Amino acid sequence: MSHKKRVYPTAQLQYGQTNIYEQHGVPQDAGAPQGQPLQSDIPYMNAQPGVIPGQGAPMMMDNGAMPQQQMFTPAQQQLNQQIDQTTAAMGNMQFNPAANESNMYYQQPLPQQQQQQQQQQGPAKPPKPMNQLYPIDLLVAFPPPISDLSLPPPPILFPLDTIPVPSEDALAPSNYIRSTLNAVPKSNSLLKKTKLPFSLVITPYQHLHDDINPPPLNEDGTIVRCRRCRSYMNPFVHFNQDGRRWKCNICNLFNEVPSFLDRMPNDTMSNRYMRNELRYSVVEYLAPKEYSLRQPPPSTYTFIIDVSQNAMKNGLLGTTTRTLLDNLDSLPNHDGRTRISILCVDNGLHYFAIPSDDQEGQQVEMMDVCDLDDAFIPRPDSMVVNLVQCRNNIETLLTKIPQIFQNNIINKFALGPALQAAYNLTRNEGGKIIVVSATLPNIGVGQLKKRVEEANVGTPKESQQLLTCQDPFYKTFTIQCNKVQISIDMFLASEEYMDVATLANLGHFSGGQTHFYPGFSAQRITDATKFSMEFAKHLSMDTSNEVVMRARGSTGIRTTGFHGHFFNRSSDLCAFSIMNRDQSYVFDITLDENIAAEYCYVQVAILLSLNTSQRRIRVITLALPTTDSIAEVYASVDQLAVTAAFTQKAIDKAQDTSLEEARRFINQSVEDVLTTYKKELVVQNTGAGGMPLRLCANMKIFPLLMHALTKNLAFRPGRVPSDHRAAALNYMESVPLKYLLKCIYPTIYSLHDMPDEVGLPDENNEIILPEPINASYSSFETYGLYLIDNGIDLFLWMGGEALPQLVEDAFGVPNILEMPIGKQEVPVVPESPFNERIRNIINRLRNHDDVITYQSLYILRSASNSDPVQANAKELSSLRMWASTHLVEDKIMGSEGYRDFLQMMKNKTSK
């Protein structure tokens, strides 16, 4: 491949250069307000390795080692690593510290004052290290530094030299669990004063398949738990001097150390300090028999397939059976016991009795049941069959199903009776019901009607009339399913109304998921590809069944709210018939009483059964420092986790009250945070004309994310089809954090001016991606090429004034009017390295191993003065409008731009 650089026009002014600030009325030398230190004066920016800002140089032993009594020394390595990672991205940020350095830490005692206090009070214990607060002016730090979206959260400063096995592995990885507050208020009154949520964002699994980077596994059957609170031994427990008792860090009870903790299964002595539970914050146990009420059941997949006229016309039936046929080997079957059942549905139920392959002369038999009120199962013993033993006959059936129903003219779909039949088929063992439908359920129990959208869309009645469950069957049925360990996944693909708001309840309360494919037509290869890719990844995904998850907190900490797809069995226990691998959960925490300890703990335990016939326990333990300083609380806020927590609360308000109330809540949350910060933490104010809008540096992206959230399809005002809005709400309430953020604030790449190495493999054979740009039209050039990624779809946007050479290199056509438009793939252009790099980037963005999503690609171009009247002008105009809604920093859909939003917040907080 030739690496000769193709030079296209590039912007003369880039963000970060002085002239861009002059565009917004900011002088060239406005790096910091007058009388305030520059970036180079901020301790955080000049931190030396091994030194916490404000703590001075570390003490050293004669041999160069750190003294043992410095409680922050081991944790400092983590802080230094995260500082190193963030320094480059923070270089372009416009920090605006407090008015003078004496107030840098918000009226903390100066060194002389500290010395005097210590002399008065006697020998004082060294203060524990805490994150420091660095204020900025949001209106000056503009455009917002979106590189912060990829930064790690503020470090959790914990004295690792105080635990049995000092190790960085004892600190919980943020991809498993994130706390909105990495310094916990010691009292509920302080927590309320902050106006910040105290929540945990929990992602128990990081990959679709369990064999990728699994956590350490204890296979010896040794499980040590506190006899009072039932928490599991973890890195933060303590042993007494003789090592015979251990102190629980959750409830502070001393427990006897079992003798088997120091012995191997073969009765030889072992070193307890090498055990995984004392070294790692995330660990998994192979559970003994007492953790099982029964033998782990086989994995069972029951497919309810729509064979009505709609499913035939749009090609969904053929696409489904072909994909299932091609992926039978991908179904998890580690123990060889996986079972399968297929049920076709229109206005009746079509069962299939599938004989085993060794039964010569026996063929698959179809049995029809038309009495939906009293449906029975003709031959239950041959309806749910072993995948291995009946493999050939299953393949034969999947090949014949499209032929059997190819002339079907029935436009009915009896989903309710089909669900009841599937329930009766699998109630003894449990399992997963997968529904594939192109038709609104319109006959039998649970039949639905098309709602009146015209009169309710965009009105205060929208939530209650269009986004609530239309029939209680879809909630009560999930209660039955949870009792027998059945979950439900929905794949809805149609050009017609499907009532996603109602049907999504099936997945929501059973631990499943609803996938929506509006306007689906298998005749469009892009639609068929997206459905097939996602359906195939869903089939191959590892799952756990018979799952319960509980979070235990140390003294004063209690979980009170739960968000995600599961059934809340009790006040602190979440039940999952099936736990998929591509979901995340948010737990809200309250403080029942004041916390006296310097550190608090939360432990999440998940009891589950695997497809390997094993019962396991996954334990995640999080340690957090506590504080009675609101400044230290704000300095340790994880702005991304806070966004996730507020998003879940906004979803609840959208579904329970109104969309207007949800938007009001989002904006009010930002106002409350800014007002509290100004009232409690801003030491000095300037005159009214130059009054800044202060917030701490670690939260500078929070207002942007919340503002962008109001413009998301789930919340934005205006006319949005109810199925699309309901699908967006359903997606956001369960998607892992990094995809939630991309859904809120889309990632945009500039392709026409990307460096030579971008789009090509690095030393690890990973395609290098461009640096994202701000989601604003001011970031665009009329002659540029841009790629927008919202986590669900991709948009390749060509500027209307692009040079012919750029168009030819990208699409292989000499004229911009000839470039492809709409939902399609980038054509392969031989001997065009630029075209190959574009396709490499798109493929990299689609290559996920933690979610099943396969983004559709939409190609469009901007309008230009030379645009002729074209047949697809309406489609192109709609596509431009849709793509422009992703420029969330701008004025779109009647909402204000981000700068105006900040100005509005400044006015409100100044009252």
UniProtKB/Swiss-Prot annotation:
Record InterPro entries: ADF-H/Gelsolin-like_dom_sf (IPR029006), Gelsolin-like_dom (IPR007123), Gelsolin-like_dom_sf (IPR036180), Sec23/24_helical_dom (IPR006900), Sec23/24_helical_dom_sf (IPR036175), Sec23/24_trunk_dom (IPR006896), Sec23_24_beta_S (IPR012990), SEC23_SEC24_subfamily (IPR050550)
Assigned protein family: Belongs to the SEC23/SEC24 family. SEC24 subfamily.
GO BP terms in the entry: COPII-coated vesicle cargo loading; intracellular protein transport; macroautophagy; positive regulation of ER to Golgi vesicle-mediated transport; positive regulation of protein exit from endoplasmic reticulum
GO cellular component: COPII vesicle coat; endoplasmic reticulum exit site; endoplasmic reticulum membrane; Golgi membrane
Function, as annotated: Component of the coat protein complex II (COPII) which promotes the formation of transport vesicles from the endoplasmic reticulum (ER). The coat has two main functions, the physical deformation of the endoplasmic reticulum membrane into vesicles and the selection of cargo molecules.
Membrane topology, from the record: Peripheral membrane protein
Endoplasmic reticulum found in the keyword field: yes
Biased composition (Low complexity): 108-123
Assembly and oligomerization: The COPII coat is composed of at least 5 proteins: the SEC23/24 complex, the SEC13/31 complex, and the protein SAR1. Golgi apparatus membrane; Peripheral membrane protein; Cytoplasmic side.
Protein known as: Protein transport protein SEC24-1
Subcellular location: Cytoplasm; Cytoplasmic vesicle, COPII-coated vesicle membrane; Endoplasmic reticulum membrane; Golgi apparatus membrane
Predominant place of localization: cytoplasm
Region named Disordered: 108-130
Keyword check for Transit peptide: no
Superkingdom of origin organism: Eukaryota
Pfam families per the UniProt record, alphabetical: Gelsolin, Sec23_BS, Sec23_helical, Sec23_trunk, zf-Sec23_Sec24
Positions of region (Zinc finger-like): 226-251
